[in-house]
UniProtKB/Swiss-Prot annotation:
Function, in words: Binds to actin and affects the structure of the cytoskeleton. At high concentrations, profilin prevents the polymerization of actin, whereas it enhances it at low concentrations.
Localization per record: Cytoplasm, Cytoskeleton
Transmembrane feature ranges: none
Protein name as annotated: Profilin-3
Entry annotated with the keyword Disulfide bond: yes
Gene3D superfamilies cross-referenced by the UniProt entry: Dynein light chain 2a, cytoplasmic (3.30.450.30)
Protein family: Belongs to the profilin family.
Post-translational modification Phosphothreonine, affected residues: T114
One GO location term (cellular component): cell cortex
């Protein structure tokens, strides 16, 4: 299965609310910042933004004072799982990033999608990739 298929079928899929809602954008990005696959709506990001995210996984709390920046958008960092998941909030939307052995699984949402729904979609794929040794 191609990485794009994972994005299209497992991240940008209808959320299990039976109303046809889905994430706004999603991507799978290597730890080095290279994009493996992304939705057409995923923002262009700067290398330093991805470096900051990777630093926060290695040094939890690194992004808390400055916020998480991706594609020029600033998210307030909220509770996550140290070294495994970073969550951010901006207005009525937000972002979830799950770290696997080789990649970052990223999902961005806006209402009516909830933070919990985004977390479920992103972390389910991230956990699967971890189980596969990826």
């Amino acid at each position: 299965m191609s990485w794009q298929t994972y994005v299209d079928d497992h991240l940008m899929c209808d959320i299990e609310d039976h109303e046809g809602h889905r994430l706004t954008a999603a991507a799978i990005v290597g730890h080095d910042g290279s994009v493996w696959a992304q939705s057409a709506t995923f923002p262009q990001f700067k290398p330093e933004e991805m470096n900051g995210i990777m630093t926060d996984f290695n040094e939890p709390g690194h992004l808390a004072p400055t916020g998480l920046h991706l594609g020029g958008t600033k998210y307030m960092v909220i509770q996550g799982e140290a070294g495994a998941v970073i969550r951010g909030k901006k207005g009525s939307g937000g972002i979830t990033i799950k770290k696997t052995g080789q990649a970052l699984v990223c999902g961005i949402y806006e209402e009516p999608v909830t933070p919990g729904q985004c977390n479920m979609v992103v972390e389910r794929l991230g956990d699967y990739l971890l189980e596969q040794g990826l």
